[in-house]
């Protein structure tokens, strides 16, 4: 049984995994949490932890909207409380995924993640009552939206401790309004027990191109799903036929860890070779400068700075500019 002295969010995660029959994972959680939140590995972690801990006690009465473009929590804050909250939330910058509106504080994130959700959501099997895994889920924006769409249990796994504390900050505002259905574990997919076959839907959005072994990643995703479960895959692609795969040099759009960019047709073939059925390309389009940009909450360089200033169809390195595709596939029964 979980230690009752754990922070509420961690205790809720233990309880949820037990409730969903994932006791094998529960045994691994203490070590995974200790590793993912290791102060020796992450020098800024104490500052993020302190910022979340200093958020003030909030009024019980609140209106929480997890199904709106901006994940929103409306509650009555004094001017002093709102100023304190905003200062603490800014200590967790940069905020990359969102947007959020928390107690009247609008967090205008680098990515308009709501636009991605609008492209993805119409093509999903209904999430009502489903168990969902969100691999590389950032600070949890899409996880909240999944619960807003009716998911019974959402587990976000992402190895970034900054994202973990951004999620916990949002959790502070949401409170228990989601019925403790949304959870975050600061680990990568490698920490998911092998052959788990526990989730009805698994998302991997913005992860595949960071993987030096993309087929291994697809098979890891497959093994998280129950028979008949659904995979939602979003990644960078290039234009071309079923044999087109591009591997950039040291950097792509200034990112150092980008490996394989297939065409959407090649990616569909990869999914089929990895044992998926009913593979569909449901969306494909260039990433727009309006969707990814610098803001007051993410003040560093963004997409506009990574493109050729003379030709926005090319990256700084001369490669095709970012283009993303969404594919949906099913694991056989």
From Swiss-Prot:
The keyword tRNA processing applies. Coiled coil: none annotated. Keywords: Transferase, tRNA processing. CDD domains: AdoMet_MTases. GO terms for biological process: tRNA wobble uridine modification. InterPro entries: CmoB, Mo5U34_MeTrfas-like, SAM-dependent_MTases_sf. One of its GO terms (molecular function) is methyltransferase activity. Carboxy-S-adenosyl-L-methionine binds at residues 97, 111, 116, 136, 158-160, 189-190, 205, 209, 324. Gene3D superfamilies: Vaccinia Virus protein VP39 (3.40.50.150). The keyword DNA repair does not apply. It catalyses: carboxy-S-adenosyl-L-methionine + 5-hydroxyuridine(34) in tRNA = 5-carboxymethoxyuridine(34) in tRNA + S-adenosyl-L-homocysteine + H(+). Its EC number is 2.5.1.-. It is an enzyme of class 2 (transferase). It holds the Pfam family Methyltransf_9. HAMAP family: tRNA_carboxymethyltr_CmoB. Belongs to the class I-like SAM-binding methyltransferase superfamily. CmoB family. Catalyzes carboxymethyl transfer from carboxy-S-adenosyl-L-methionine (Cx-SAM) to 5-hydroxyuridine (ho5U) to form 5-carboxymethoxyuridine (cmo5U) at position 34 in tRNAs. Homotetramer. This is tRNA U34 carboxymethyltransferase. It comes from Chromohalobacter salexigens (strain ATCC BAA-138 / DSM 3043 / CIP 106854 / NCIMB 13768 / 1H11). The lineage of its organism: Bacteria, Pseudomonadati, Pseudomonadota, Gammaproteobacteria, Oceanospirillales. The gene is cmoB.
């Amino acid at each position: 049984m979980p230690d009752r002295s754990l922070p509420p969010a961690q205790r809720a995660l233990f309880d949820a995994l037990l409730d969903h029959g994932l006791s094998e994972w529960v045994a691994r959680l203490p070590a995974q949490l200790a590793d993912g939140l290791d102060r020796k590995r992450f020098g800024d972690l104490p500052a993020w932890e302190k910022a979340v801990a200093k958020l003030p006690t909030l009024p019980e009465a609140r209106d929480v909207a997890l199904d709106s473009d901006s994940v929103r929590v409306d509650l009555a804050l004094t001017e002093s409380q709102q100023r304190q909250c905003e200062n603490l939330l800014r200590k967790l910058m940069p905020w990359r995924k969102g947007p959020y509106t928390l107690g009247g504080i609008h967090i205008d994130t680098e990515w308009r993640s709501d636009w991605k959700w609008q492209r993805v959501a119409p093509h999903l099997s209904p999430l009502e009552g489903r168990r969902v895994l969100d691999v590389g889920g950032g600070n949890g924006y899409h996880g909240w939206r999944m619960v807003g769409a009716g998911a019974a249990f959402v587990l976000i796994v992402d190895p970034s401790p900054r994202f973990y504390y951004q999620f916990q900050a949002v959790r502070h505002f949401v409170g228990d309004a989601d019925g403790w259905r949304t959870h975050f574990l600061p680990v990568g997919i490698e920490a998911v027990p092998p052959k788990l076959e526990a989730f009805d839907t698994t998302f991997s959005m913005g992860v595949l191109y960071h993987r030096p072994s993309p087929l291994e990643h697809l098979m890891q995703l497959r093994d998280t799903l129950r028979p008949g479960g659904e995979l939602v895959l979003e990644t960078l692609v290039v234009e071309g036929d079923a044999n087109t795969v591009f591997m950039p040099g040291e950097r792509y759009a200034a990112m150092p860890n980008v490996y394989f960019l297939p065409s959407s047709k090649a990616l569909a073939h990869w999914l089929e070779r990895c044992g998926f059925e009913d593979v569909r390309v449901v969306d494909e389009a260039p990433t727009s400068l309006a969707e990814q940009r610098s803001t007051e909450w993410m003040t560093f360089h963004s997409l506009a700075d990574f493109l050729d200033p003379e030709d926005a169809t090319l990256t700084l390195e001369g490669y095709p500019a970012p283009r993303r595709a969404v594919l949906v596939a099913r694991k056989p029964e």
